[in-house]
Amino acid sequence: MKLILLGAPGAGKGTQAEILCRELSIPTISTGNILRAAIKNGTPTGLKAKSYMDAGQLVPDDVIIGIVTERLAEDDCKNGYIQDGVPRTIAQAAALEKAGITFDDVISIEISDETIMERMSGRRVCESCGASYHMVAVPPKQEGVCDKCGGKLVQRKDDAPETVKARLEVYHKETEPLKDFYAQRGLLKPVENQPSVEETSRAILHALGR
């Protein structure tokens, strides 16, 4: 089974990818991870990507698609995979198609901007031990203090409301159109975000006929 997980930042794609990876016994192909691995291993596309990154430039789509294609050709992807991080745009989706990379299903986790703002802006992390909290869902016993080590709890820059809002704007402009792209191909399966991680996982598996 070859899957794409779509959803706004904060929709829980990474968490759901981990669960699906276990349930379906297929690997999650994270674009960030395979990009770093390609650079570390010195592959031709990895070296090309590194040249752009060293110059402080964005890695072009054709290089990203090349790295993804290399990774999907490995043995552990023969029975399927969960694609995470690419495509982010219509151009990338079209490039994947042109490269002969196909998918069986595209899951879109549906969640409101308001819920995402609440979810992400409530996150706190211990600057000493890295433990994670949420001011509503998993609050610390003492506000601003880590239960585990007594360290200071801080809000990451990525979780600040203004940053979250900016990321959502980019998602709606560049990535959300992929839903129509894959709906036209009969691949899109929208799944409503549920109150718990487990319920969302069950809804995704149900949409996949599992």
Predicted feature residues:
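Glycine-rich phosphate-binding loop of ATP-dependent small-molecule kinases
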Residues: 1-210
